[in-house]
Design a protein with these regions (language model features):
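Alpha-helical transmembrane segments and their immediate juxtamembrane cytosolic regions
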Residues: 1-272
Length: 272
């Protein structure tokens, strides 16, 4: 029964996470030549003068097939699909967590898996930190190792945390915001590149960020109009993740029209 549930869980994650990742990156690859014609992407070498940008060359059918094979094992991604690192990490971590949970429940008579899962999360965080230090992130596994502990913390907090009343919730939000302001003086977290000052910093920033979002969401849920808007955003998470870099382009285009900027600057990433 438990093995059957694990298989169904894995199948669901393949359909809801892996397939959108591969499909979206493949579509972006298919549209590369069109994007080059309208300057959403560019082969103009002047774009390299802007930090974080790269030039793009036209693709062939062979390129599309080869790159799709790479996307299928999370080997790289497209520039416009850059935000999908989150989908990749969530797929890898959720499957690993579920697989470990299945094995632990088979091995442990008590059925309590939080402690061994926590130990594994600590080991993976250390490995993710070492991967960051040497610049290793093959197939996104460095990011997945670092983020496993955050998934674990989410499981723990889901069990023990309950929303506070308005007064305490507002106080928790304010406290979490202050903690994040203080932490911001010492560094930042960039999980898309597996970048953070250290394991303890990552944990502290993540806990504070979670508290701010969790308590803030419960406060906003008391306002019907706001609650409905956020519910709609939640249901549209996947399209937002896939399309939001592309959605920046109309904003950049309007800015270039207003300032008379050169057309190749439309390809500036993420925005000019």
């Amino acid at each position: 029964e438990s093995a059957h549930r694990l298989a169904r869980f894995a199948k669901r994650k393949v359909v809801t996470l892996w397939l959108p990742f591969v499909a979206a990156n493949t579509v972006y690859t298919l549209l590369t030549n069109l994007f080059l014609k309208v300057n959403i992407l560019t082969g103009d070498e002047r774009i390299l003068d802007l930090p974080g940008n790269l030039i793009t060359t036209p693709v062939t059918i062979k390129d599309i097939i080869g790159r799709t094979a790479h996307w299928s094992v999370f080997d790289g991604g497209t520039q416009l699909g850059g935000a999908m690192w989150f989908i990749q990490a969530l797929f890898q971590i959720s499957l690993l967590y579920a697989g470990v949970e299945f094995l632990l429940k088979k091995l442990l008579r008590s059925g309590d898996t939080l402690i061994p899962q926590g130990l594994l999360a600590g080991v993976l965080l250390w490995l993710g930190w070492q991967a960051q230090r040497i610049g290793w992130n093959v197939w996104g596994l460095g990011i997945a190792a670092s983020c496993y502990c955050l998934f674990y913390l989410g499981v723990v907090l889901h069990r023990v945390q309950h929303p506070h009343g308005p007064a305490r919730g507002a106080l928790c939000c304010a406290g979490a915001f202050v903690v994040l302001l203080v932490l911001g003086q010492f560094g930042s977290v960039g999980l898309a590149g597996n970048s953070y000052p250290g394991p303890l910093y990552l944990l502290a920033a993540s806990l504070a960020g979670w508290m701010l979002v969790y308590e803030g969401a419960h406060l906003l849920a008391r306002v019907p109009a706001v609650s409905g808007a956020f519910s709609a955003l939640g249901r549209a998470t996947m399209p937002i993740v896939i399309l939001h870099f592309l959605a920046f382009k109309p904003v950049t285009w309007l800015g270039l029209l207003a300032t008379g900027g050169e057309s190749y600057l439309l390809a500036a990433f993420p925005i000019y």
